[in-house]
Each structure stands twice: as structure tokens, then as C-alpha cells.
Design a protein with these regions (language model features):
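A conserved beta-strand element that flanks and buttresses the S-adenosyl-L-methionine
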Residues: 108
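A short glycine-rich, Lys/Arg-flanked "PGG" loop and its adjoining helix->strand segment in the class I
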Residues: 122-134
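Short catalytic micro-motifs in class I SAM-dependent methyltransferases
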Residues: 111-112
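Helix-capping/helix-break motifs at membrane-protein junctions
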Residues: 117-118
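Class I (Rossmann-like) S-adenosyl-L-methionine-dependent methyltransferase catalytic domain
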Residues: 1-17, 35-39, 44-45, 51-96, ...
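Conserved class I S-adenosyl-L-methionine
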Residues: 23-32, 49
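Short glycine-centered segments of the SAM/dcSAM-binding site in methyltransferase folds
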Residues: 25, 136-137
């Protein structure tokens, strides 16, 4: 999709659906190449933290975003991923987010949990709960598996091909 447009649309969603304020402390789980961070640079006054498993994306964000916006920090998650970070040392289902408990008023993950197996999703949700302040908000995106999407999968009409048995999810 359109990189800039989608980032701006999500900023609007963060503000309207999750009541994002400029004063919020934000964690971007799976920050990628900054699609969500870039529009936040014009809005967020407080701390932003992002992490990702793709070294090139983290390096780009550090070079082009953090250098201009010192309240925006990006770090590489040393999570093993065959496609994105094969040298990673930690499995996603055991990864501990590198932040203190109750650190963030808003946490989001867009197009992240759809890349994880159920035990890793459980871990990520537990980690989000740990780092989220008691009155914090969270926005996560998922694939919707309902009767219609299951029918499309079975008929071969789905846009995404699920390689794993989705009956156990």
C-alpha cells in the first residue's frame, strides 16, 4: 500500500480509537521502516520506542528519524526469524520486551501478530500487558478468521495463504 497514506491513516486511528495524545509514551512493536513513526514525529511530544527484527529497517530509522527526533528511539530485537533475522538468538515465544513494567501509555502492533505462531502471540500480548501502564491503551491488528474467510481459504480465493493449521488458533 501507500507508505505515507497508510501511516497517516493509522495516526488518525490512534487518535480517534485509542485516544492518543501528544503527551503519551508510545511503544511500536515491530516498527519496521518507520511507517507509523514518521507521522508520529509531527504529533508526539513525549517518548517513542520502536523495535523490530529487521536490522536494515532499524538502522534506517535510527539514521533518518532518531537523528532528527531525539525522543524517537529504535532498537533491534534479537529474535530469530528465518526470513528477516536468521542470526537472532531468542525465539519470539520467549522474547522479553526490553522495557520496564508500566512504561508506556500507548502500545501498538500493526501487521506483527499476523507473522507469529500462537505461542509467540501469547508471549507478545503478555509482554504488552507488562509494559503498558495500568490506565494505558493498546491497539493491535489481526487477520479475521470467520466463516467467510475460512470459506475463501478452502476455495483458494483468499489473498493470504496460511501455511499452518488455523484450526488451533
Amino acid at each position: 500500500g501507500d507508505f505515507v497514506r497508510i501511516g497517516r491513516e493509522f495516526l488518525d486511528i490512534f487518535k480517534t480509537e485509542a485516544s492518543l495524545l501528544p503527551s503519551d509514551t508510545v511503544l511500536d512493536v515491530g516498527s519496521g521502516i518507520g511507517r507509523m513513526a514518521i507521522p508520529l514525529t509531527d504529533y508526539l511530544e513525549n517518548r517513542y520506542e520502536g523495535f523490530d527484527v529487521v536490522p536494515e529497517g532499524v538502522n534506517w530509522c535510527q539514521k533518518y528519524i532518531s537523528s532528527r527526533f531525539p525522543n524517537f528511539n529504535f532498537q533491534l530485537a534479537d529474535i530469530h526469524n528465518r526470513s528477516y533475522h536468521p542470526s537472532g538468538k531468542v525465539r519470539a515465544n520467549a522474547y522479553v520486551f526490553p522495557y520496564e513494567q508500566d512504561s508506556f501509555s500507548f502500545v501498538f502492533a500493526t501487521s506483527v501478530l499476523t507473522h507469529l505462531l500462537p505461542d509467540a502471540v501469547d508471549n507478545y500480548i503478555s509482554q504488552i500487558a507488562r509494559v503498558l501502564k495500568p490506565d494505558g491503551r493498546c491497539l493491535l491488528t489481526f487477520f479475521l478468521l470467520n466463516d467467510r474467510s475460512r470459506e475463501n481459504l478452502e476455495c483458494g480465493h483468499a489473498q493470504a495463504d496460511f501455511k499452518f493449521d488455523n484450526g488451533t488458533y
